[in-house]
């Protein structure tokens, strides 16, 4: 009886499969090297100081390109400073000209700042807020419309959901005690529903003090690069130093639509210089004006 010839097909298939896997690995390695070379992909750092989940020493930064504007102006870039509350700083959000424009527009109409009474919805004087301010109607002029459109583009919240711009001025010693921007009553949510987010734009630099502080923020907030520049009030929580043109976005509600107690915030007293800012509150629904 003649012996059957050996079948070499299995080994050939195995060899072919190994070659395919090897080729895929080579191609994957090549793609990763390209991504690393162009800075699209980055290698995480294993430094002990940045290993904590809430460590702020490594802050996410992304550049947002200007469209149709002068390239000589400072570029905008984003700094995520906290996840509890969710807060980001948009650097160079406003131009110097826009900051000066809002200040000059508001100056003739400044009055002592008030707070909202939760029972009546009316404005009332309070010792917790010692600044002066005024409101600029939504869509009042071309410059304001451009700023409001920019806020909408950055937050993905329609312009129609925003209240009017509030411009505030703090002189030496003036402050705003920690508070929530969201409401705990039904009266103030009749128009537009709850406040979901706040965009706080800094219209001037402040020599000392005047920080926006989040005393209930979670995380190692003492790790921020500007920690040593903060006042004693500013070191009472996660703080942002006012810088002309920057905008602070923070959310008063979590992604599951519950109110976020870590969004508690205040304005530290101005120690040296003066502070100008503009606030845009954003609602869940359309805010009728």
Curated annotation (Swiss-Prot):
Primary residence: endoplasmic reticulum
Required cofactor(s): Fe(2+); L-ascorbate
Topological domain spans for side Lumenal: 41-289
Chain positions recorded as Fe cation binding sites: 179, 181, 265
Gene Ontology cellular component terms for the protein in this record: endoplasmic reticulum membrane; Golgi cis cisterna
EC number: 1.14.11.2
Lineage of producing organism: Eukaryota, Viridiplantae, Streptophyta, Embryophyta, Tracheophyta
Pfam families per UniProt: 2OG-FeII_Oxy_3
Job description of the protein: Catalyzes the post-translational formation of 4-hydroxyproline in -Xaa-Pro-Gly- sequences in proline-rich peptide sequences of plant glycoproteins and other proteins. Hydroxyprolines are important constituent of many plant cell wall glycoproteins such as extensins, hydroxyproline-rich glycoproteins, lectins and arabinogalactan proteins.
Ranges for domain Fe2OG dioxygenase: 161-284
Top-level taxon of origin: Eukaryota
Sites carrying sugar chains: 220
GO terms for MF: iron ion binding; L-ascorbic acid binding; procollagen-proline 4-dioxygenase activity
Protein keywords: Dioxygenase, Endoplasmic reticulum, Glycoprotein, Iron, Membrane, Metal-binding, Oxidoreductase, Signal-anchor, Transmembrane, Transmembrane helix
This protein's name: Probable prolyl 4-hydroxylase 10
């Amino acid at each position: 009886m003649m012996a059957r010839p050996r079948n070499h097909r299995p080994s050939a298939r195995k060899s072919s499969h190994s070659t395919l896997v090897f080729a895929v690995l080579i191609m994957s390695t090549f793609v990763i090297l390209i991504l690393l070379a162009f800075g699209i992909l980055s290698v995480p750092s294993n430094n002990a100081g940045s290993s904590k989940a809430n460590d702020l020493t490594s802050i996410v930064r992304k550049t947002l390109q200007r469209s149709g504007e002068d390239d000589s102006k400072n570029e905008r870039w984003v700094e995520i400073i906290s996840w509890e509350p969710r807060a980001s700083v948009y650097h160079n959000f406003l131009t110097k000209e826009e900051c000066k424009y809002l200040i000059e527009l508001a100056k003739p109409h400044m009055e002592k700042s008030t707070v909202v009474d939760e029972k009546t919805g009316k404005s009332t004087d309070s010792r917790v807020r010692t600044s002066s301010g005024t409101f600029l109607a939504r869509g009042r002029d071309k410059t304001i419309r451009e700023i409001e459109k920019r806020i909408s583009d950055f937050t993905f919240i329609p312009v129609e959901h925003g209240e009017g711009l509030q411009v505030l001025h703090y002189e030496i010693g003036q402050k705003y005690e920690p508070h929530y921007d969201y409401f705990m009553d039904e009266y103030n949510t009749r128009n537009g529903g709850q406040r979901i987010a706040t965009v706080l734009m800094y219209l001037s630099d402040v020599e000392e003090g005047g920080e926006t502080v989040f005393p209930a923020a979670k995380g190692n907030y003492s790790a921020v690069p500007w920690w040593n520049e903060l006042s004693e009030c500013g070191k009472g929580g996660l703080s942002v130093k006012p810088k002309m043109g920057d905008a602070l976005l923070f959310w008063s509600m979590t992604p599951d639509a519950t109110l976020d107690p870590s969004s508690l915030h205040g304005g530290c007293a101005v120690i040296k210089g003066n502070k100008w800012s503009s606030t845009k509150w954003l609602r869940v629904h359309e805010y009728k004006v």
